[in-house]
Swiss-Prot record:
The protein's name in its UniProt record: Phosphate acyltransferase
Pathway: Lipid metabolism; phospholipid metabolism
Quaternary structure, from the entry: Homodimer. Probably interacts with PlsY.
Purpose of the protein: Catalyzes the reversible formation of acyl-phosphate (acyl-PO(4)) from acyl-[acyl-carrier-protein] (acyl-ACP). This enzyme utilizes acyl-ACP as fatty acyl donor, but not acyl-CoA.
Name of the top EC class for this enzyme: transferase
An example molecular function term from Gene Ontology annotations: phosphate:acyl-[acyl carrier protein] acyltransferase activity
A single cellular component GO annotation: cytoplasm
Major subcellular location class: cytoplasm
Domain of life: Bacteria
Family: Belongs to the PlsX family.
Gene: plsX
């Protein structure tokens, strides 16, 4: 019998919650029946949507207090220890759950997580990471905004954590790490990135292959699968990629529906267009991972629907099954 995976869920964060959250749980449970959900939020509202789930697979911890999307990180933390977000994080701190997920305020989630959870030994800063599609499979990209300024040690830690995350999600593949830079030559970049390059090049990287630098126009090539940057650079890359994907899908839709020729072309290519649309569907890649703390914290996009939230729950399942925290501890020494 497989181990029961316990997920602490903030049911009140993000748009259209708790309905979206509970619908996502219902959808996730259909293919993950070895999951137990600790659900934090307004019990009366939650019970309106949870009738599809066996009562043995969940527990509702009632609270009407929540962190608002408009709160600053500090305001969110000051709302107190009875918010659904705080209580969910407290659950993993007390080892009542294996992992925590929220679609709520990102800044508040990071601050409350850091207030409650300890850093993994020998790691100075946590990082925000996410999954990106590439031509061959998927890539882990970090940091996406948790740390604006980073030292070479921070970037080396991110390389180790990112490769550990990749291996926990894709255990049969080799982690290949690259540093995001303005060029591929060794002389390019600032002093921090060049020093990081030198140290990674000289390090005995048994847990990953170091592939040097990668430029922004190569992120989706699939030649590497762990891309490391400081939070300032990484966040700009993330927003640029999201905007480009939205532009492409929007323009393609207009081209295919604008006139009779476009409509006929779209009908003739409906199978390929469907595959293309699915490849760019952000719901499939929903679920940013806050790593470096001694318990994993998952951030679902607040504007996603129940399918996107279900996919972020699947990321939770794979991370716990893949022993992410243990991998980081073993590799960071």
């Amino acid at each position: 019998m497989s181990k029961i995976i316990k997920i602490a869920v903030d049911a009140m964060g993000g748009d259209n919650s708790p309905k979206k959250i509970i619908d996502g749980i219902n959808h996730h449970y259909k293919s993950n029946t070895n999951t137990f959900y600790q659900i934090f939020g307004d019990k009366e509202k939650i019970q309106n949507y949870i009738n599809q789930l066996p009562t043995s697979s969940f527990e509702i911890i009632h609270t009407k207090d929540l962190v608002k999307g408009t709160d600053s990180p500090l305001e969110g933390a000051k709302r107190g220890k009875n918010t659904s977000m705080w209580l969910a994080i407290q659950s993993v701190k007390e080892k009542k759950s294996d992992i925590v997920i929220s679609a709520g305020n990102t800044g508040a989630l990071l601050v409350i997580s850091k207030l409650n959870l300890k850093m993994i030994e020998n790691i100075d800063k946590p990082a925000l990471s996410a999954l990106w599609p590439n031509k061959k499979n998927m890539s882990v990209v970090l940091d996406l905004g948790a740390n604006i300024e980073c030292s070479p040690k921070n970037l080396i830690d991110f390389s180790i954590m990112g490769s550990s995350l990749f291996k926990s999600l894709y255990p049969d593949d080799t982690a290949k790490v690259a540093l995001l830079n303005i060029g591929s030559e060794e002389i390019k970049g600032n002093e921090t990135i060049k020093e990081t390059y030198q140290q990674l090049n000289q390090r005995n990287n048994t847990d990953f292959e170091f592939k040097g630098y990668i430029e922004g126009n190569q992120l989706m090539n699939g030649d590497v699968n762990v891309i490391v940057a400081d939070g300032f650079t990484g966040n700009i890359a993330l927003k640029t990629a999201e905007g480009t994907a939205n532009f492409i899908t929007s323009e393609l839709k207009k081209a295919m529906t604008g006139n009779i020729v476009g409509k006929i072309s779209s009908l003739l290519n409906i199978s390929n267009l469907k595959k293309f649309k699915e490849r760019l569907d952000p719901r499939l890649y929903n679920g940013a991972i806050f790593i470096g703390l001694d318990s994993p914290v998952i951030k679902s996009h607040g504007g996603t629907d129940y399918i996107g939230f279900s996919n972020s729950l699947s990321v939770c399942t794979r991370i716990v099954t893949g022993n992410l925290i243990e991998k980081i501890r073993n590799n960071i020494c």
